[in-house]
Amino acid sequence: MEIENTRDSDSMRGSRVGFSGSLVSGKKSARFKDDESYVEITLDVRDDSVSVQNIKGADHEAALLASRLEKRPNNTLGSQLSFHLRQVSKELKRMTSSNKFQKIDRSKSGAARALRGLQFMNKNVGTEGWSEVESRFDQLAVNGMLTKSLFGQCIGMKESSEFAEELFDALARKRCITSPAVTKDELREFWEQITDTSFDARLQTFFDMVDKDADGRITQEEVKEIISLSASANKLSKIQDNSDEYAALIMEELDPGNVGYIELYNLETLLLQAPSHSMNLSTNSRVLSRMLSQKLKPTKERNPFKRCKRRLDYFIEDNWKRIWVMALWLSICAGLFTWKFIQYKRRAVFDVMGYCVSVAKGGAETTKFNMALVLLPVCRNTITWLRSRTKLGKIIPFDDNINFHKVIAFGIAVGVGLHAISHLTCDFPRLLHATDEEYEPMKPFFGDERPNNYWWFVKGTEGWTGVVMVVLMIIAYVLAQPWFRRNRLNLPSTIKKLTGFNAFWYSHHLFVIVYVLFIIHGYFLYLSKKWYKKTTWMYIAVPMILYACERLLRAFRSGYKAVKILKVAVYPGNVMAVHMSKPQGFKYTSGQYIFVNCSDVSSFQWHPFTISSAPGDDYLSMHIRTLGDWTSQLKTLFSKVCEPPTGDQSGLLRADVAKADYKPRLPKLLIDGPYGAPAQDYKKYDVVLLVGLGIGATPLISIVKDVLNNIKQQKNIEDGTKGSKRSPFATKRAYFYWVTREQGSFEWFKGVMDEVSENDQEGLIELHNYCTSVYEEGDARSALITMLQSIQQAKSGVDIVSGTRVKTHFARPNWRQVFKRVTINHPDQRIGVFYCGPQGLVGELRHLSQDFSHKTGTKFEFHKENF
């Protein structure tokens, strides 16, 4: 023990005493399991009192309890100090041995931490007032009594009616209420206890819920029942199935004496064991966090011109690549339209057809250009080569190739509209109603006899080709819309069969016919007779040849890239993992994708799937989620040859061809690729933030594995392993956030999670799993799951939800806090943010990337995978 005594030079009235030493000796308690845990306590000693001035140390609970020291008269410094140190030690022992529930006075920080772990009630309940509950009582009550079945709806917990009924029973038992209904006054008492935010009240409520017979003790059977209930409320089927095992685990932890029950103080001991991660933040991190919060506060610029200028500056900064590409495209379209418009304004036909013919020909010229340009963004091999082998990616947004393809398609629609409408509603009617004298200059183009009706124009080659093209374009455009392509509309079954990905796929191939008709239509022109003035073929010749070569290359390459299937796993959640042999010379980058064909399902359909294996692996793997007809049929084929699940793998089917004595007949797969994708740019960043939702984690898992392989490689170089060469790998830190709805989803990448945990000794890869089916930490319905998770993690290092060494968080991440933490850890750096998942989260992540980039020195560059 060390004692430090410092006295004020001007006055002898006060002094501070520092103590550093072990607060607990002898037998270890559940709260203080390490005899070598020390704390430093600084006491402020006055003439007639002693108070705690400062507490530092390894165990935050010592600080919590030491704050209870009362002010007492000071006889001598030595005796007073000794008395209070004994009091601290005595208090610690009392807290770990008492079997009576008492009110505990805690420091502000300790109470805040405890409440974060014990805010049992649904946040919707906590935010509502009694007036709302009373109003619902008046609506739901019958003869002034509210039944147990309506209790959850009344207090705002209607989504978990079963759990609400358990809460009702606990509150009723406490008050000796045996009726299955309560009055308004009794409900008011229930409400006051539910909304009491003190640590002790909520701990007591939780204890009462578990203690079914109200004897003040919890048996293993009662623990099992509440585990099963909590698991059911959180859709954790595996925990529910193993509730016996987990109940025994809790009893083993809290009932070391094997007396057969646990009491309230046992729960308190467990729940107040270790400070949370946020409590261990360094002082510098806290200061930075506060400063960052101030920076990120929205500031309202009063001057509207300055406000608009700032928004414009931010917009240009975030979208300059898109801006210059769009500006160039619009300029070319406008230039072509203007050139053709002026050209026809100077021709003799203008006197009869007027501005209509100029508009029609201007629209036709832009259509020629766009029909040529629309093929380039879908030349996948060319785009991949430009992205991977050149530096054009610094100025060209290759990530937006599909979006640009859609924009060009819209430009085609505008051009076709201008061309067709101007002809059909304006210049053709003018020609039909022209006098003989006015028609005279038109004879070289339309013949000696003036057309007498619309049918004359339609039956000609120029007419019927145009009509057929427009019809085919409309079909392809409509079926390509996400409402039809992803089957988002509730359509009758007969019509629904005509939509979906298959309809999109086949209708898009109608453009082969469209391009043939487009060339014919552009050759048989009314107003241009010389071949060199018929420029349609000149526009589209090179793009069509390039696209045709792409398709031939795909067909040739896929023909000899038949892969051997090594292993198949069909997981819960309609996900299937396929491990294949890697074709000779097949090179790829994490984040890229391949097209897959299975002739047993369809000889013509090719579907894209991201590669989930890392470039350094000796196999190829992909994870496929069954969402449509093709993937459903593929899963059915593989399921027939898979083995049934073992006892610890609920719903998991496997077919390990490499190890099996009997070689099952598996479907034959062809692959085409790899092709470039936004996620492959991760190597450009020292730090990456990877966000995946559900099956969207696939490309990001490949990145995580690649970063891990690079860590191993660099370690070999540092250890002097021969033959190792340093690769141009910039990524030094990765944050991976995976959000999924179902517990079974964690089976998909369980091996990768464990491998990272075992090999990443320096913590360069942070893995964060979130299960949204579990109520957020602090909710009553997940309280016991959180407790069980802590015990299991401490005992075996395995998370009970994911089954991996990575701890699972509940509900959804606070993305602003995620960005804030990365900003604090990496000031003034470029962070690559890569997202793959549904469209719903894109806006929030893009906004946060822009907001933090604008207001801090850390620059976040957002990349979205086309999902």
UniProtKB/Swiss-Prot annotation:
- Outcome following mutation: S82A: Decreased activity
Please list the residue ranges annotated as the EF-hand domain: 198-233, 242-277
Where is each Ferric oxidoreductase domain found? 361-519
Where is this protein chiefly located?
membrane
InterPro entries, per this entry? Answer: Cyt_b245_heavy_chain, EF-hand-dom_pair, EF_Hand_1_Ca_BS, EF_hand_dom, FAD-bd_8, FAD-bd_FR_type, Fe3_Rdtase_TM_dom, Fe_red_NAD-bd_6
Point out residues bearing the modification Phosphoserine. S82, S97
According to the record, the residues making up region (EF-hand-like 1) are: 141-149
Residues annotated as coiled-coil are none
Q: What keywords are annotated for this sequence in UniProt?
A: Calcium, Cell membrane, FAD, Flavoprotein, Membrane, Metal-binding, NADP, Oxidoreductase, Peroxidase, Phosphoprotein, Repeat, Transmembrane, Transmembrane helix
What ranges does the Extracellular topological domain annotation cover?
344-358, 429-463, 528-686
Q: Which domain of life is it from?
A: Eukaryota
On whether NADP is a keyword of this UniProt record, the answer is yes
State its Enzyme Commission number(s): 1.11.1.-, 1.6.3.-
Q: Where is this region: Disordered?
A: 1-20
Q: What induces it?
A: By fungal elicitor, arachidonic acid and salicylic acid.
Protein name from the UniProt record: Respiratory burst oxidase homolog protein B
